[in-house]
Regions:
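Glycosyltransferase donor-sugar binding loop
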Residues: 40, 229-245, 259
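Membrane-proximal helix-turn-helix segments that form the acceptor-binding/catalytic region
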Residues: 94, 138-165
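Conserved acidic donor-binding segment of nucleotide-sugar-dependent glycosyltransferases
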Residues: 313-323, 330-334
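Nucleotide-activated donor-binding/catalytic signature segment of Leloir-type glycosyltransferases, i.e.
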Residues: 244-262
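Aromatic "clamp/platform" in nucleotide-sugar-dependent glycosyltransferases that forms part
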Residues: 281
Length: 366
């Protein structure tokens, strides 16, 4: 099968980009031919960061010039710029090689699905919500709904073309089913199993440095537990560089921050840590949580979203207010390392991910 993977922005190096790489790797192992439609990005850096050496040498690259200063992902300006560039690249491929695809696999935002008469699979994270003018309950809400109406109609049209949504958690699936009302299946992302090392009194967190991750709370907790070491491993987002710099400036004496760590460094810290602390509320899934658990870290996560599905029973702890966290860290330190966490992490292995994805593809009629 010839599969067109659409992931407009790969430079974020977050969970979505990781899942895109996993999807490409899986489809290649199934024997499919993969073309990646994206703006130009540093393929070697991405391969090193996620540990997929030579991955992009095995795909057909359909890259267009980078779009700088044209708005954020999902904005009208960003959509117009990318969709126009995608259309030109697809037209070139068709004109010069007569190339035809069997399937479109959108691994980022549904708004970027190209207008092609093909079946569409969409990785499902979280649906965008636009208020309908018919449901506006105030003049201000009505004005806002009218302003966003063109974008709302654009997304409605794109979503209507999706044949199957692959939701990355039951939390995501529930919201996607409610808003999109498209056929869906639950497919947890594949996670690496990290070998535990010699443990020390280390608390670690891993995230893309954006405000929604609430990483400043990590330092707040660190100041309340000066006897432990705290390490923050972050990927810098080009749109939020000031946020990451601010985090480094306010790091406490017992805290350190590492920017854009290599895969080996990332695994080393997970292997040595006793506790993994996750600050975000309503996270869609949480690959780094699972990988920390595989290294026998005890996870402490907010009692919401995808992490609530991951961390259950004796596999870790869930918090509702930040005041609960320091005592949870003490408890986790006493009980480390956690065999229960490692056992639970194995439910989200790459092997299980590929088996689930293969099962879905085997049922498709293209």
């Amino acid at each position: 099968m010839r599969v067109l993977i659409v992931h407009p922005v790969m430079k974020f190096l977050g969970g979505g980009e990781r899942l895109c790489c996993e999807t490409i790797h899986a489809l290649l192992s199934f024997g499919h031919e993969v073309t990646l439609l994206s703006e130009i990005f540093d393929t070697q850096r991405t391969e090193r960061f996620f540990g997929y050496s030579g991955l992009f040498d095995k795909v057909i690259p359909l890259f267009y010039p980078s779009t700088r200063k044209v708005g954020s992902l999902g904005s009208s300006a960003h959509l117009i710029r990318h969709l126009t560039s995608q259309k030109h690249k697809l037209r070139e491929l068709s004109n010069f090689q007569g190339y035809a695809f069997d399937l479109v696999f959108s691994t980022q935002d549904a708004g970027y699905i190209p207008d092609m008469n093909l079946p569409v699979i969409q990785w499902g994270y979280s649906p965008r919500f636009f208020l309908s003018p018919l449901h506006a309950d105030s003049p201000r809400a009505l004005a806002s709904a009218i302003r966003w109406l063109p974008l709302r109609l654009h997304y409605l049209r794109k979503v209507s073309r999706i044949g199957l949504v692959l939701a990355i958690s039951q939390y995501s699936k529930t919201h996607l089913d409610e808003v999109w009302k498209r056929p869906s299946a639950l497919v947890y992302p594949g996670c690496n199993m990290v070998n535990p090392g010699a443990k020390r009194n280390l608390v670690v967190t891993v995230a893309r440095a954006v405000p929604v991750k609430r990483l400043e709370l990590f330092w707040k907790v660190a100041m309340l537990r000066p006897k432990y070491e705290f390490a923050m491993l972050v990927t810098q987002d080009p749109n939020f560089l000031e946020y990451s710099i601010a985090l480094s400036r306010v790091a406490p004496m017992n805290g350190r921050i590492l920017f854009n760590p290599s895969k080996d460094t990332y695994h080393k810290f997970l292997g040595e840590a006793k506790v993994y602390l996750h600050m975000m509320e309503r996270e869609h899934f949480g690959i780094s949580i699972v990988e920390a658990m595989s290294a026998m870290c005890t996870p402490i996560v907010h009692d919401s979203g995808g992490p609530k599905e991951i961390v259950c029973g004796r596999a870790g702890l869930r918090w509702q207010t930040i005041d609960e966290v320091p005592s949870m860290i003490d408890e986790a330190m006493r009980n480390a390392p956690s065999a229960a966490a490692r056992q639970r992490a194995q439910c989200f292995s790459i092997e299980r991910f590929e088996k689930r994805l293969a099962s879905i593809f085997s049922q498709m009629r293209v």
